[in-house]
A protein has these predicted regions:
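A solvent-exposed, charged loop/short amphipathic helix patch at secondary-structure junctions
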Residues: 184-209
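Short beta-strand-to-loop acidic/aromatic patch adjacent to the donor-nucleotide binding site
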Residues: 68, 74-90
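Phosphate/oxyanion-binding active-site loops and adjacent basic polyanion-contact surfaces
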Residues: 1, 27, 54-63, 206-208
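Conserved donor nucleotide-binding strand/loop of the catalytic core
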Residues: 32-72
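Conserved catalytic core of nucleotide-sugar-dependent glycosyltransferases
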Residues: 87-190
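A conserved acidic beta->alpha catalytic loop
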Residues: 19-31, 47-50
Length: 210
């Protein structure tokens, strides 16, 4: 919450919206207590949607509910953010990176690399590896994907962006006008991916690690 409030302070106004499903700790109690000192915090509680075994479907439901909130309460905001509410997003953030990013015009949606190992491999779809690593048999696929992503990061010059079809990594910033009508379904959409990109991914996996 501290990080979210710090990010929110960069804007003229902000709202922090949590979607609460279930947890084994005191997440909800902590959030409700924080609401007493910050009236910009809102909690949406999952009361009717039945959780399913597919994690992506549960995430899609939660994010769609938050997008509904954006459409109803914040449609005039220039940006909205999606942030994982776990320990990954609780570590110290370089707020200056976000400041510089807001002033750039060369992105519609952007996520941020982190110091250390890239943890959100399953959500990554790059120009060379357009399919998720979970479309392929393990155990070597994760290593190949990780090697490719680190190669792109090493080759990226300071100030440049890495183009991606999909990425998250815990914090995402989106231009509201571009994504206001978006909806998550949690389903694989191979019909949206050009066949040559699928074949490119397969070829890279055949060759293996750089």
């Amino acid at each position: 919450i501290n990080n979210m409030e710090q990010m929110g302070s960069l804007f003229v106004d902000y709202k922090i919206v949590f979607f609460y499903d279930q947890s084994s700790d005191n997440t909800l109690d902590i959030t409700l207590e924080r609401m007493k000192s910050n009236n910009k915090i809102f909690v949406l509680v999952n009361g009717f949607h039945k959780r399913v075994k597919e994690r992506t479907h549960n995430l899609a439901h939660a994010r769609n509910k938050m997008l509904d909130f954006v459409r109803e309460k914040c449609s005039n905001y220039e940006y909205f953010m999606m942030v994982d509410g776990d320990e990954v997003s609780s570590s110290k953030m370089d707020i200056d990176v976000l400041k510089r990013t807001i002033n750039r015009k060369d992105w519609d949606g952007i996520t941020f690399n982190r110091a250390g190992e890239y943890y959100d491999l399953w959500a990554m779809s790059s120009k060379r590896l357009v399919l998720s690593l979970w479309h392929f048999e393990q155990p070597n696929t994760s290593t190949i994907f990780r090697d490719e992503i680190y190669h792109e990061i090493r080759e990226c010059k300071e100030g440049e962006l890495i183009h991606a079809y999909s990425a998250f990594n815990g914090v995402g910033l989106y231009r509201t006008k571009k994504f206001i009508d978006s909806k998550y379904d949690g389903l694989p959409r191979l019909d949206l991916i050009p066949p040559f990109l699928i074949e490119r991914t397969k070829e890279i996996l055949k060759v293996g690690i750089r």
